[in-house]
Amino acid sequence: MVARRVGIVRYDVYASASCSVRDAKMLPWVTYDEAMAHLPQARWITATAVRDHQRIAAVRLNDAEALLEAVIAGLGRSLLPCVVADGDSRLRRIGGKRRGSVLSRELWLLTHSELRRLGRIEAAAKWIEQIAPH
């Protein structure tokens, strides 16, 4: 396997656009279930909720898309990738005082060493590198 870093995925706190920022900050945290608790974004949510004595919603999900839809539906707030959430008018960013992100993760592309020189693999890798957030 050949690995190369292709970008950075930044995360911030979002809630449904139908909620005011003030109300959204009172919503419980929607997070991942125990099978996904190892993810940095899940650990950040848990640590923040514990530190600030905030509630975690009864619903816990094992899929990032389901987490996004739960936030859009108004079930709570969550940490979402900015590259996805900023482009969705159904969401409102309610993160911290600064306009940046609260968590960043490196995005890596893994390619089988014997296949990486195939035209279709090279084309796909080049496309991923072009669209990956930096």
Protein language model regions, located:
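Short hydrophobic/aromatic beta-strand micro-patches
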Residues: 110
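Short amphipathic alpha-helical coupling segments at ligand-binding clamshell hinges
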Residues: 116-130
